[in-house]
Amino acid sequence: MSLAVLLNKEDKDISDFSKTTAGKSAKKNSRERVADVAPTRVLDKKQAYLSQLNSEFNRIKKRDSIEQLYQDWKFINLQEFELISEWNQQSKDWQFDNTNDSQDLHFKKLYRDMSMINKEWAEYQSFKNANLSDIINEKDADEDEEDDEDELEDGEEDMEEDEASTGRHTNGKSMRGNGIQKSRKKDAAAAAAVGKAIKDDQTHADTVVTVNGDENEDGNNDEDNDNDNENNNDNDNDNDNDNDNDNENENDNDNDNDDEEENGEEDEEEEEIEDLDEEDFAAFEEQDDNDDEDFNPDVEKRRKRSSSSSSSTKLSMNSLSLITSKKINKNITINSDRPKIVRELIKMCNKNKHQKIKKRRFTNCIVTDYNPIDSKLNIKITLKQYHVKRLKKLINDAKREREREEALKNNVGLDGNDLDNDEDGSESHKRRKLNNNTANGADDANKRKFNTRHGLPTYGMKMNAKEARAIQRHYDNTYTTIWKDMARKDSTKMSRLVQQIQSIRSTNFRKTSSLCAREAKKWQSKNFKQIKDFQTRARRGIREMSNFWKKNEREERDLKKKIEKEAMEQAKKEEEEKESKRQAKKLNFLLTQTELYSHFIGRKIKTNELEGNNVSNNDSESQKNIDISALAPNKNDFHAIDFDNENDEQLRLRAAENASNALAETRAKAKQFDDHANAHGEEEEEDELNFQNPTSLGEITIEQPKILACTLKEYQLKGLNWLANLYDQGINGILADEMGLGKTVQSISVLAHLAENHNIWGPFLVVTPASTLHNWVNEISKFLPQFKILPYWGNANDRKVLRKFWDRKNLRYSKNAPFHVMVTSYQMVVTDANYLQKMKWQYMILDEAQAIKSSQSSRWKNLLSFHCRNRLLLTGTPIQNSMQELWALLHFIMPSLFDSHDEFNEWFSKDIESHAEANTKLNQQQLRRLHMILKPFMLRRVKKNVQSELGDKIEIDVLCDLTQRQAKLYQVLKSQISTNYDAIENAATNDSTSNSASNSGSDQNLINAVMQFRKVCNHPDLFERADVDSPFSFTTFGKTTSMLTASVANNNSSVISNSNMNLSSMSSNNISNGKFTDLIYSSRNPIKYSLPRLIYEDLILPNYNNDVDIANKLKNVKFNIFNPSINYELCLFLSKLTGEPSLNEFFRVSNTPLLKRVIERTNGPKNTDSLSFKTITQELLEVTRNAPSEGVMASLLNVKKHAYEREYLNCIQRGYHPNVSAPPVTIEVLGSSHVTNSINNELFDPLISQALSDIPAITQYNMHVKKGIPVEDFPKTGLFPEPLNKNFSSNISTPSMDRFITESAKLRKLDELLVKLKSEGHRVLIYFQMTKMMDLMEEYLTYRQYNHIRLDGSSKLEDRRDLVHDWQTNPEIFVFLLSTRAGGLGINLTAADTVIFYDSDWNPTIDSQAMDRAHRLGQTRQVTVYRLLVRGTIEERMRDRAKQKEQVQQVVMEGKTQEKNIKTIEVGENDSEVTREGSKSISQDGIKEAASALA
């Protein structure tokens, strides 16, 4: 670049630079090569220099062409490989004939090409290995030559010391002045790795490219300028491909900006390049590039350079080799002396350090065309000014050398100086002068001839070795810079272009291969069409034949299977028919066995006659010919009987034998129990009736026992005969009379019969529910006073004492035994089962036997294990939910006959329950056989058949609609429930979930959900009650008398001080004498405000400073029309009109408050004028007017007033409820106690307080009796009505009871119903399922002031007895609240004639028993039953299920299929009633009475 500065005449602003800088830089680069040129060999050295430069460019061109060939070979090889692979992939399905020899013809050419390619690759490898050895030898020679040059340079170091010292001084100032050199040296050190790769390529060259330059420029300028490029190369080596693209884009942008700055210079240089002759390039000699290590694979592996840097360098070198043939260099003639040239060099170095021109002006390269066929790449390269001038110089030097040689050969005779002058003259028009002095000494310089010892041209100036090396180093750096610029800018573009070309070529190859494949397939389809058609037809024929035979085999197999299946079905059907016949015979055998036994027992005890039913002849046709008493008892094993071979007659005989055997076993068991008892008891007389032999009893009629203290009715006496016959036969039974027919007295009468007629006084065991224990004890004591009763209940210690009365030695008790009958509960039986099982009981009675309806319960199992001669079950509802409960009772009394529940279920349960649920057709024959089996063991009479004086009860279902709050709660529950609502309703209708003890977790969750819905139907307050609302009271409350009394006694001054009283003024004497004043207002505000006296006197107190007194005087005196001094005529007229003698009275009244005027008028003096006469009525009214507001007299005289206040004023409710309340702030005026007392006592005015409050009763008594004050003289009190006083005197708001009633549909209807029933004189039983609902009902009854009592499960046994007694004897009690489970069993509540079910039980029989507490013997009035239901809720589903259960009971017990008579009344939102009749007509009077009650 220094040569370009010398040639550039326009650069005249270069600053001075130190001359010693070159010396300092020379020491750092002392190992640079310098050519020793002799003065006598100037032309030879120039020629050598030009030849060396030409060889450099030729070597670069050759390297690029080899690289291009190598890349083309690799690309073609890869494409051929991909083409072959794709072709093979597409030709996999080609089929060839194995016998044809031409099957591999299409592969032979391909194999031949592949072998040729492999051979070429081997030759190329050998060529590369040979070149590698030559490169190594050349490197060794270059190193020897460098050693020689170093020795030459050491000799010249002494000559350069002076210049070096001067350069250091100047350089030091420059560095301290600018502060740039240190940073550039650091950047140069960081770029050493990249510069090393470029210097390696320079060492491979034969000679140095440049001969001019400056050492200082190399050390400072070149290093500084190369830092950016080298740093970018380092970044390219360290970063990924993504970062490479970013760096390339940044470099391209920088280069583009540099190109824009020198567009004008490039245009001029390109015009000069186009004028050059192409003949000038013939002088360059071509040499082989033996040092090409870049294309050797082995050497390339050892080099760890960046791929982007190496590819960019190669591409730039290729581009430069193509452009060297187009550049022309000019011959350089120096006309100035050595100091001027040195100054120009210093200016050149300082110019590069300037900030504005610090950047290099890089070369621009553009690819214009690429021909892949000829492997020709056309590149347009635009060089900057410096590069163009350098090439011009080189080309001109070569041209001059060529002309000089031609002149020498032709003997022109021109010497070297003339030639130089000609050359200088020819090129003088193209050169620019460095300064004004160059033109003056131009001719002298051309005439001088210089000879140098080192062989380098000095161009007419004296140049030492150091300056020559600097110029050489400059051209070396310029050469490196050119390659860096081209590598950085153009390599990426060329790489992208090559990749694009390769992708296009790959696409074309792929398309070509696909086209070849298609063409090959066409050829194949033409040649092999007949073969393919033949194969297709053969395959189709084979497939059709295979399908035909497969179809044929499948049809034969299906036909065979069908025949086998029909045969199996026929055999199965025959087996099923045979099995059904066998099962029918088994069922008939079992039924016949049971019927024979039942028929025999029925004839003995005559159950049909006792029930009042006529027996048809058809019922006993099958039993007339067989007498089981005459047959020999023989037990036939049921499983050993051959039901297939034996006929019906033989099976009947076997069944009769089994029935006879069962009868014999029953008798033997009873005889064994009696014999064992007789062995330990008293011996009986021989002539006494032997009751142990029932066959000798015959038909006898038992009379009522004499020890029974009552008279049995006819049907009860028949029941006694039936029970006695059962005992005689040793058979257990079920007394299932309808509730209220006296099952208790019948069971007591049979005990009296055994004691009186058979001298069996026990031990007898009676097990009852806990609620009927006292009733049984009372009944036995009442009807059998001679019996000793042992009530067995209480705690563990009490029961332990009671067990001492047991006599375990004697199995039969006498009259003098410790006890005769022990009464206990089911709970005690389970608790003390171990003790009770040790006793042998003569007779065990189970009251309310539905308690053992479950065969899985501990009650059933424990009671079944007791040792008893006979068992008697008392129940009004033997079937509550299903037929399984009936089987449990039957198995309990006859385990030998009813031993299998599955058989019983097969006989009756399925048919009857399905009939009740699905209303299917009932098998009447099967129902008749069931009744025949049950009759000997169960006696049931209905009230209407045996008790004519007891009328039918009227049942009415009252349907209500949900209120708004209930409907919202119901919908919220339905939306929040996780289970389907239909499943919940089904669970509500499932009876097993409510009674079974072993419910699953899911069923229990369903039941809980059902209970939530039932709570909504009953009352929404079951979820959340409305609380009492009270504001925060910012108040100091007054202390009551009791608190003050305790405070005085304890000398607690804090309480008294809070009450604004002095302890000294109080004494126990005053407290005990009651000298306290009753105050209706005692609360005070905790805040006390002290009003300044100045403000009071100036603003409030009337004075001359304000108009307070004037305004009051004007308003009350001057503007008052009743002032006599102003309006005398009006006052006189009013005085005459009213008879008031004083004219000032009107003025006084007008200034008196209204309340005080009313009080004064009522308390005014009586008129004692003798002329006024009053009647007795008027005097009584006068007394009435002044009567006190409390007491009996006030209540009697003010009935109308109290009714008005209760009905109307009570409805007034507070509309606003404040959150905070406080009395007025206490105001005190400092220094004025009068004002403070008047303000504080404003609410305690005696006249107002007395008028608003009531005089206590004790005070009235003392005033009238002790002090003798007449009643008419009492002050008027109670002017403020009590309801308003209750509602407005306090901010505490309680929940409204009216709203409490109206928010529940059931309670609202019940409220209307109770009003009617109360007015008509009825007494009501109300049954509940929830005790919490009973609590709410008690609040309602207290609000309505209905007299009521309550009995639930928490009531004690002694309390239950007293409650029942009070209900039966006290007619003032209007309502009896009972829980269905606790109050629905075993108690007599005939004092009530109305039963209301607020919510129904799961089991309809529980409700039936609860109804019969009132509808039983002793009831003389019509009984009406109301059932409250909510329409469209879960209660309707429960009611439907209850009706199905009731139908099952009717079918089994009565044989009826008609629905029960129930009247339904639907109450809508507007309280309109719609009556729906039942299936059977009932008493019209009862319906009218019930309807009138609901009206």
Curated annotation (Swiss-Prot):
Residues 140-164, 214-297 have a biased composition (Acidic residues). Keywords: Activator, ATP-binding, DNA damage, DNA repair, DNA-binding, Hydrolase, Nucleotide-binding, Nucleus, Phosphoprotein, Transcription, Transcription regulation. A motif (DEAQ box) lies at residues 847-850. The modification Phosphoserine is found at residues 65, 115, 133, 616. Gene3D superfamilies: P-loop containing nucleotide triphosphate hydrolases, Tandem AAA-ATPase domain. One of its GO terms (molecular function) is DNA binding. It comes from the Eukaryota. Residues 1309-1473 form the Helicase C-terminal domain. The keyword Ribonucleoprotein does not apply. It is found in: Nucleus. Residues 137-317, 399-458, 1462-1495 are annotated as: Disordered. Residues 724-896 form the Helicase ATP-binding domain. Residues 307-317 have a biased composition (Low complexity). Pfam families: DBINO (PF13892), Helicase_C (PF00271), SNF2-rel_dom (PF00176). Residues 399-408 have a biased composition (Basic and acidic residues). GO terms for cellular component: Ino80 complex. InterPro entries: DBINO (IPR020838), DEXQc_INO80 (IPR031047), Helicase_ATP-bd (IPR014001), Helicase_C-like (IPR001650), INO80/SWR1_helicase (IPR050520), P-loop_NTPase (IPR027417), SNF2-like_sf (IPR038718), SNF2/RAD54-like_C (IPR049730). ATP binds at residues 737-744. Its main location: nucleus. It catalyses: ATP + H2O = ADP + phosphate + H(+). The DBINO region is involved in binding to DNA. Component of the chromatin-remodeling INO80 complex, at least composed of ARP4, ARP5, ARP8, RVB1, RVB2, TAF14, NHP10, IES1, IES3, IES4, IES6, ACT1, IES2, IES5 and INO80. ATPase component of the INO80 complex which remodels chromatin by shifting nucleosomes and is involved in DNA repair. Its ability to induce transcription of some phosphate-responsive genes is modulated by inositol polyphosphates. The INO80 complex is involved in DNA repair by associating with 'Ser-129' phosphorylated H2A histones as a response to DNA damage. This is Chromatin-remodeling ATPase INO80. The lineage of its organism: Eukaryota, Fungi, Dikarya, Ascomycota, Saccharomycotina. The gene is INO80.
